[in-house]
């Protein structure tokens, strides 16, 4: 297991690498060029500056999250060709600086969606919350206002240039159903996977969050059947997944221990977090501790250990603790606690395995 920490860059994150370095066991930083407009080529000098800064603190910079996919590609319109070519060049450029995994998603318009960024928990902390009925009755513009008011930092997948075109995008997606979105993902992968494979980069698609349609927009990476369909597109070693327990696990029909058991081999990158699911379909993000939520984090980690998992792992969204003013879900304290819990589980399974063989 290669423990990492997501960081949004200098001037774009309340957490500094000086602080991350003080968390035991963190080997790498998961990063991106968040200032780049979606669809633009990530230039070599920009990549060099960011990776050298990360490496100056003793971290590797082998995982990028995310190189976002332009809406023209998801829509499959006449503009997608140039954006796909830009994406290919970005893959080449990143590989030249040691990047081995690129996380991406194929969610139309919105990235991860929540209705409350700072929902109070019983212990006094706050966390990201999803109210299903509210989303079903909410105008997308209201959701955008909720997100914009929650932080003065741009949230990934909620870029201002995209939100300014929200009505136009919704109109464009009226003709895109799940089947069409799968066709567009297939076209994209058939184009980029030969490049990724040639340059030794694994493309790790992130599940939809939450894993069901919202605002009438299709969602296609929602469960085990999605992974089977993804691999049917191409069995390239570069056609991979990001195992995200909190995203896919928000649907209780998705058994994350079984999914880890079956698909860890094609998951070079894992996001580990817990959510508490309510009977009405709402969910709230909790601590990483297994008993605090609905996902068997302990079982997922045990399964990864059984498979001698060598992929990159990071704690995912954390609660907001001890008065920390931070990007929603991405403070320092709870993610640091999450790392210690995950490392503790891993160490315990390691000790048990050694005891079984008499070491």
Curated annotation (Swiss-Prot):
EC number: 4.2.1.8
Cofactor: Fe(2+); Mn(2+)
EC class of the enzyme, as a word: lyase
Annotated Pfam families: UxuA (PF03786)
Pathway: Carbohydrate metabolism; pentose and glucuronate interconversion
UniProt keyword terms in alphabetical order: Iron, Lyase, Manganese
Top-rank taxon: Bacteria
Catalytic activity from the UniProt record: D-mannonate = 2-dehydro-3-deoxy-D-gluconate + H2O
Plastid keyword on record: no
Transmembrane segments: none
Record's keyword annotation contains Nuclease: no
GO molecular function terms attached to this record: ferrous iron binding; manganese ion binding; mannonate dehydratase activity
SUPFAM superfamilies: Xylose isomerase-like
Induction / repression: Induced by galacturonate, repressed by glucose.
Example of a GO biological process term: D-glucuronate catabolic process
Functional description taken from the UniProt entry: Catalyzes the dehydration of D-mannonate.
Family according to the record: Belongs to the mannonate dehydratase family.
Extra remark: Member of the exu locus which is required for galacturonate utilization.
Entries under NCBIfam families matching the protein: PRK03906.1, uxuA
Protein name per the record: Mannonate dehydratase
């Amino acid at each position: 297991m290669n423990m990492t920490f997501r960081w949004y860059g200098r001037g774009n994150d309340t957490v500094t690498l000086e602080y991350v370095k003080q968390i035991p066991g963190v080997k790498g930083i998961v990063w991106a060029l968040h200032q780049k407009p979606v669809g633009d080529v990530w230039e070599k000098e920009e990549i060099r500056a960011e990776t050298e800064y990360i490496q100056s603190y003793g971290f590797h910079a082998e995982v990028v999250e995310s190189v976002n996919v332009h809406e023209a590609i998801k829509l499959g319109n006449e503009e997608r060709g140039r954006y796909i070519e830009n994406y290919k060049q970005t893959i080449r450029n990143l590989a030249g600086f040691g990047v081995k995994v690129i996380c991406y998603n194929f969610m139309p318009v919105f990235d991860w969606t929540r209705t409350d960024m700072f929902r109070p928990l019983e212990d006094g902390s706050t966390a990201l919350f999803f109210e299903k009925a509210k989303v079903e009755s909410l105008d997308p513009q209201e959701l955008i206002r909720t997100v914009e008011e929650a932080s003065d930092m741009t949230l990934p997948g909620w870029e201002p240039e995209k939100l300014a075109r929200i009505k136009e995008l919704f109109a464009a997606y009226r003709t895109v159903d799940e089947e069409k979105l799968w066709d567009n993902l297939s076209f994209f992968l058939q184009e980029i996977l030969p490049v990724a494979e040639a340059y030794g980069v694994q493309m790790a698609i992130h599940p939809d969050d939450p894993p069901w349609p919202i605002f009438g927009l299709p969602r296609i990476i929602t469960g085990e059947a999605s992974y089977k369909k993804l691999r049917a597109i191409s069995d390239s070693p570069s056609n991979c997944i990001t195992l995200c327990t909190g995203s896919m696990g928000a649907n209780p029909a998705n058994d994350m221990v079984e999914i880890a058991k079956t698909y860890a081999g094609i998951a070079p990158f894992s996001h580990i977090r817990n959510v508490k699911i309510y009977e009405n379909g709402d969910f709230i993000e909790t601590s990483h501790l297994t008993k605090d939520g609905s996902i068997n984090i302990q079982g997922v980690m045990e399964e990864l250990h059984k498979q001698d998992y060598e992929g990159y792992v990071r704690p995912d969204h954390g609660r907001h603790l001890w008065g920390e003013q931070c990007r929603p879900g991405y403070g320092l304290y709870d993610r640091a606690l999450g790392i210690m819990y995950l490392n503790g589980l891993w160490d315990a399974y390691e000790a048990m395995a050694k005891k079984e063989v008499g070491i």
